[in-house]
Amino acid sequence: MTSMLEIYSGCRACSYDYLSVLYEQYFRKNGIEAKYVGTLVRPTDSQKFLIDDILHGSHELMRQRKKVDFFRGDSVLYPWYDFHIDSILIVPSNWNAEQYSKYFRKTYVLPHFVNDDAVEMIVRNEERLKEDKLRNIQYSFLTIGHNNDFDRKGIVLAKRLMDRLGISNKLVCYSNEPFCHKEHRLTEVGKYREYYRAKFYVSLSYSESFGMTPFEAMAVGTPVIYPNCHAYAEYFKGEVGLPINCQGHSIMRIGDKDYNVWYFDIDEAKEIIQYADSMSDEEYIDMSIKTFEFAKQFYARNIIPKLIEIMKS
């Protein structure tokens, strides 16, 4: 049995590839030898820390009859699907834990990490933010996300809202959607630079579990426009950024999958986007600094202690 902790990803075409690299960095910073290997392709005799789609990974684990020490999941769930895996499950929010925990030995809630090395290359402190943020803004709104099955990440919705308001030229998006500027293949540093260049990050997901975390944008002082429900309400509590009230929760069947989704007021979303677009420089900088401080304190108080607890387990 090797002492090397191998980190696996289930998808190189989306955020899991980036997240796998981040786990490797955080483990090494805390004195644990770790290596990002790639996609899960065959059993090995080493320890495994799997970052993967909850269902695809479950099928693969059962097919190969293997046990992993840590299993990372943040996707949809088949409510009728019956399985049990003798592993620790790590999910990014209680929103996920409510759906998945009964299938695993133990469940931890741990939001995805911010790449602090990349953040420090862009903005080190509040004073730097005050001096540089406004003059570095190149566009008003940014959204990033790989859409699948339906507009789960809110990429199409963001575009439609901007179209209705006549400001679609102010939205920059990185996604697999054909109207977007680029497929999401940003490097870590490149991704944070894009966050910093945006005045606001638009995150209108119907069922967000923080697969691509809005904390990344917040870490460089970019406020988030978001629906105040599911994981957003859990972590932000409407205290930061520009929240949109949610109207209710439902189950959406797309093909053979059931998605837990929330609905929010589209008219209110338009009003908030208009308000953000017309915000004064003084008000914006105040919000940017509050966003930056919120993200920094949240990670210091919640993420790092929980990460250490999980590693000790």
Swiss-Prot record:
Its EC number is 2.4.-.-. Keywords: Glycosyltransferase, Transferase. It comes from Acidianus filamentous virus 1 (isolate United States/Yellowstone) (AFV-1). SUPFAM superfamilies: UDP-Glycosyltransferase/glycogen phosphorylase. InterPro entries: Glyco_trans_1. GO terms for molecular function: glycosyltransferase activity. The keyword Glycosyltransferase applies. This is Putative glycosyltransferase ORF313. Belongs to the glycosyltransferase group 1 family. Glycosyltransferase 4 subfamily.
